Swiss-Prot record:
Gene3D superfamilies: 3.30.1490.50, 3.30.1490.80, ATP-grasp fold, B domain (3.30.470.20), Glutathione synthase, substrate-binding domain superfamily, eukaryotic (3.40.50.1760), Glutathione Synthetase, Chain A, domain 3 (1.10.1080.10). Its EC number is 6.3.2.3. This is Glutathione synthetase. Binds 1 Mg(2+) ion per subunit. Homodimer. Catalyzes the production of glutathione from gamma-glutamylcysteine and glycine in an ATP-dependent manner. Glutathione (gamma-glutamylcysteinylglycine, GSH) is the most abundant intracellular thiol in living aerobic cells and is required for numerous processes including the protection of cells against oxidative damage, amino acid transport, the detoxification of foreign compounds, the maintenance of protein sulfhydryl groups in a reduced state and acts as a cofactor for a number of enzymes. It catalyses: gamma-L-glutamyl-L-cysteine + glycine + ATP = glutathione + ADP + phosphate + H(+). It is an enzyme of class 6 (ligase). The modification Phosphoserine is found at residue 415. Pathway: Sulfur metabolism; glutathione biosynthesis; glutathione from L-cysteine and L-glutamate: step 2/2.
Length: 474
């Protein structure tokens, strides 16, 4: 995609002045992170990295991503309710991947005891890149779906004003008017509020499971503030706090510090290093409760790479979403090529394909949080090591998406403004709420655009690679 900011990106003096104005506006709007030096304190903060200009995104692909989000919500919820599918899909993975196995063990314990919760809440973000087709036109391809701790809905609500400001400074008022309004935090809070309401106790609270060191706290506060505006109170606690002060009564109602909890919202618990033995016990306690969990353990498992790969098999979508051929077609149109690495002929063929053309593939473990995927020579070495080992079942292989690079200027604290070749990743936030078997809410609630220099193969904003951006529809 060509950029219409080309001439602006060549004027170094103008860029420096614009960058100063943009940073000041970002700080004024609350596009903030705590510093890496003081991740537990808000005494000193910095702006979150962002692009100086919004990046061009084809309107048709933006509309397609929005149109399919409610289908993805339904699909995740269908996987959540299909214990047999989850068990069959993850059977080889849990033998080789300890983290997935621990999550699945909690899932089995909860099923055996009987699921206490009647309200189910999903706050998802489906991420896409724009694949360059052979004829040069871009196509929407899903990278992953995040079913736990899908972040930046708060900060993404604050960046449109920054880009409108930059374009207004340049007297580009018509262009400024094309920046889409975007407020994911409001929509995410609506989902939490609906789950809280259905829980049915006006004195109950929302519990946000937080990390001790949380640089991205302002993103979370945006959702907390939306809830407080509805007179719904949020308490922030760590897994360690739950171990010490969490309990269930005989009806499996959850209490923390003596206060009843209606909804548990996880902003922690998606990576192995976030769990001590004590934390695993706390997670089990939360899962056994009748509070609505966002996500519950089955929904977290539904977001694994292995489930994503299995959903791409012929017939799987039809089995999970019977009688919904239009939804199935919309979903399938976004799938990239995904391959199992389970032991056997199918896995052997996938490895042979990747070794023959490594630039076309990416090797993905069952991990969230960014920066875990393997590319190029690293992938080749890993596949050679894994080729004859059952450990390979803990990975999947995915066809690499190759977007058309474009120029933009990246702004980061402590670094000069940098004009580089970039690629973008578009995320769409989705919310659904189910009460027992009845779906009471299913909607898309906003978007997130992240952009990074092309030399970075993997990693998001939190991993220090990508920066916040806005789509400029063309």
């Amino acid at each position: 995609m060509a950029t219409n900011w080309g001439s602006l990106l060549q004027n170094e003096q103008q860029l420096e002045e614009l960058a100063r104005q943009a940073v000041d506006r970002a700080l004024a709007e609350g596009v903030l992170l705590r510093t890496s030096q003081e991740p537990t304190s808000s005494e000193v903060v910095s702006y979150a990295p962002f692009t100086l200009f919004p990046s061009l995104v084809p309107s048709a692909l933006l509309e397609q991503a929005y149109a399919v989000q409610m289908d993805f919500n339904l699909l995740v919820d269908a996987v959540n309710q299909n214990a047999a599918f989850l068990e069959q899909t993850l059977s080889s993975t849990i033998e080789q991947d300890d983290f997935t196995a621990r999550l699945f063990d909690i899932h089995k314990q909860v099923l055996k005891e009987g699921i206490a919760q009647t309200v189910f809440l999903g706050l998802n973000r489906s991420d896409y890149m724009f694949q360059r087709s052979t004829d040069g036109s871009p196509a929407l391809k899903q990278i992953e779906i995040n079913t736990i701790s899908a972040s930046f809905g708060g900060l993404a609500s604050r960046t449109p004003a920054v880009h409108r400001h930059v374009l207004s400074v340049l007297s580009k008022t018509k262009e400024a008017g094309k920046i889409l309004s975007n407020n994911p935090s409001k929509g995410l809070a609506l989902g939490i509020a609906k789950a809280w309401e259905l829980y049915g106790s006006t004195n109950a609270l929302v519990l946000l499971i937080a990390q001790e060191k949380e640089r991205n706290i302002f993103d979370q506060r945006a959702i907390e503030n939306e809830l407080l505006a509805r007179n719904i109170h949020v308490i922030r606690r760590t897994f360690e706090d739950i171990s010490e002060k969490g309990s269930l009564d005989q009806d499996r109602r959850l209490f923390v510090d003596g206060q009843e909890i209606a909804v548990v919202y996880f902003r922690d618990g998606y990576m192995p290093r976030q769990y001590s033995l004590q934390n695993w016990e706390a997670r089990l306690l939360l899962e056994r409760s009748c509070a609505a969990k966002c996500p519950d353990i089955a929904t977290q498992l539904a977001g694994t790479k292995k489930v994503q790969q299995e959903l791409s098999r012929p017939g799987m979508l039809e089995m999970l979403l019977p009688g919904q051929p239009e939804a199935v077609a919309r979903l399938r149109a976004t799938f990239a090529g995904l391959y199992s690495l389970d032991m056997g002929e199918e896995g052997d063929q996938a490895i042979a394909k990747a070794l023959a053309a490594p630039s076309r593939f990416v090797l993905k473990p069952q991990r969230e949080g960014g920066g875990n995927n393997l590319y190029g020579e690293e992938m080749v070495q890993a596949l050679k090591q894994l080729k004859d080992s059952e450990e390979r079942a803990s990975y999947i292989l995915m066809e690499k998406t190759e977007p058309e690079p474009f120029e933009n200027c990246l702004l980061r604290p402590g670094s000069p403004a940098q004009v580089v070749q970039c690629i973008s990743e578009l995320g769409i936030f989705g919310v659904y709420v189910r009460h027992e078997k009845t779906l009471v809410m299913n909607k898309h609630v906003g978007h997130l655009l992240r952009t990074k220099a092309i030399e970075h193969a993997d990693g998001g904003v939190a991993a220090g690679v990508a920066v916040l951006d806005n789509p400029y529809p063309v």
